[in-house]
Amino acid sequence: MNQTPWKFKTFRDLLLKSVAERDLFTGKSLHALYVKSIVASSTYLSNHFVNLYSKCGRLSYARAAFYSTEEPNVFSYNVIVKAYAKDSKIHIARQLFDEIPQPDTVSYNTLISGYADARETFAAMVLFKRMRKLGFEVDGFTLSGLIAACCDRVDLIKQLHCFSVSGGFDSYSSVNNAFVTYYSKGGLLREAVSVFYGMDELRDEVSWNSMIVAYGQHKEGAKALALYKEMIFKGFKIDMFTLASVLNALTSLDHLIGGRQFHGKLIKAGFHQNSHVGSGLIDFYSKCGGCDGMYDSEKVFQEILSPDLVVWNTMISGYSMNEELSEEAVKSFRQMQRIGHRPDDCSFVCVTSACSNLSSPSQCKQIHGLAIKSHIPSNRISVNNALISLYYKSGNLQDARWVFDRMPELNAVSFNCMIKGYAQHGHGTEALLLYQRMLDSGIAPNKITFVAVLSACAHCGKVDEGQEYFNTMKETFKIEPEAEHYSCMIDLLGRAGKLEEAERFIDAMPYKPGSVAWAALLGACRKHKNMALAERAANELMVMQPLAATPYVMLANMYADARKWEEMASVRKSMRGKRIRKKPGCSWIEVKKKKHVFVAEDWSHPMIREVNEYLEEMMKKMKKVGYVMDKKWAMVKEDEAGEGDEEMRLGHHSEKLAVAFGLMSTRDGEELVVVKNLRICGDCHNAIKFMSAVAGREIIVRDNLRFHCFKDGKCSCGDYW
């Protein structure tokens, strides 16, 4: 067919416009005409069809267009390598890269960026060294990609910074912007600030946006907002990325009113329907507004014209951060897939967080299986770390360790998750051994590591070791203790019965003790029956959390235990006067992939009669081997209790009902996992120890503080929780 210059030019312009606008419909129509030879076959045009399909996420079409190119050139290969890397198929991208007859700098940059997206630091560094050895010119794109690939290795980022300065690359805005971003993500805000202010005239919009985000990440929201105002004053263009950065700053300030006002400005400017800005708004409301904020997040979500994967992930994350909405997170995850979005690493991290709150063994396996089927690479550390947390929070410490042991690469988060899992399950010694392995592996601990380690020391009574770790954190690793570390130390001393030392510790804190510290001290006082100190701790908590029932309930329990009925009545009267209500005890267990919920003294479960009959028979067997009901947990004065009232109350606590249902509904020898919304009561704790011995079962109970692993009449908590 004869071809005229105007026909080729028109066709080319339409194709380039389709690529720029990601217009798949027009692009496919043009491709059909191209195949019918309306214009002559051309490597140039074929390359742009590959590029179009890649940008539109149609890898199969991109592959077909590439292999139909008669004479592929280096650009052809670069585009298809990028397409496979973008689709998380980095191994195929590498195979295609190796087939390039004469790769250029762009080829290397493309694959290095692919390795960065895949978090394959080592492979990116090896490729960079090969590139330099073969004499290829390194440019700003090379270094920017390499810095991103080293996002988990601050030591390598520092080395690259030295290389960029010595090589003159510090004059590239893109390189400096990458350093600002990844220094911040690596926890080095000071270095990020130094790079930003050292750029002077090189600073562009990306530089300002990156620095605003950095301040937000480090809870320096006021500085972020000041920088935003300075950016406007200096005449820089404000775009959707800037606005999202400001939302991040407002989120770090927990500034709900300011965020709502900013939302109003976004609506006036017409940015609220943008996916990037919308994602920032959803994140803001979910973090600053709690459960109520999620209603605002849902409204924002509904207004976004075309929610992309990031928006869906943010919505799922918001639900998962609010435990009561975990079911909604799972529903959104499924809905996202139904409309055609394929979950990525972030999707799985968010949904596993929600499933952790639900403690559903069947969902653990489903999510893990789906991650494998979705071709999420086995070396994705973030997904594996999330699976470790999912398994141990669902009571399955063995599978958590199975995932940990098979990870091709471990980082600080991996060790933190596993150490925390051991600590919460009462396996303090194993947690400390793992911490030592972490040090031997050359991975530096962080503040979260020490929270887990100190918690492990508390659970296994290693007071001296705990104090040593606390000192090491400050002196060796230069980590300043935060409120959570002090709370762990108070818990450690309190568990060991060193209440005066714990009180001195709380009084010597460099800042005002928070509710977690006083709650830890109150729990220790309850264990060791120190009424005077308990009253002080409870009163402090009542001031800090005036509507929380926990300090009132714990103090009332202690008064009841000491037979101080008037004081107990006074606490209860105070609760009624302030309209503070204790949450009803609620426990649930999953049997045959179905969740069964039990509430204390509630008869709504369809099998409650059979459960009570089974429990009565179990109680008879337990009493024969030494179980005695601890009636003080009934919280009823002896002279006011009717015959059998105390036994009736204690016998129908939700955790006992859930365990009884599990025993009668599952095979002999099968492990049970029960979740309770409140702290397990002393009598139930003792009763379940006997139930585990009589039934010959391992019973795991997760309350609102920790895990209790009952086996052969003993509990992993050592009877202190």
Swiss-Prot record:
Q: Which UniProt keywords apply?
A: Repeat
- Positions of the UniProt region annotated as Type E(+) motif: 593-623
UniProt region (Type DYW motif), positions on chain: 624-721
The segments carrying the PPR repeats are: 42-72, 73-103, 104-138, 139-169, 172-202, 204-238, 239-273, 274-307, 308-343, 344-378, 380-410, 411-445, 446-476, 482-512
- A Pfam family cross-referenced in the UniProt record is E_motif
Q: Which GO terms describe its molecular function?
A: RNA binding; zinc ion binding
List, alphabetically, the InterPro entries matched: DYW_dom, E_motif, Eplus_motif, Pentatricopeptide_rpt, PPR_At4g14850-like_plant, TPR-like_helical_dom_sf
Which SUPFAM superfamilies does this chain map to?
Answer: TPR-like
Record has Coiled coil as a keyword:
no
| The keyword RNA-binding is assigned to this record | no
Enumerate the Gene Ontology biological process terms. RNA modification
Which region ranges are annotated with the description Type E motif?
A: 517-592
The family line of this record is: Belongs to the PPR family. PCMP-H subfamily.
**By what name is this protein known?**
Pentatricopeptide repeat-containing protein At3g49710
Q: Which organism is it from?
A: Arabidopsis thaliana (Mouse-ear cress)
Question: Upper lineage ranks?
Answer: Eukaryota, Viridiplantae, Streptophyta, Embryophyta, Tracheophyta
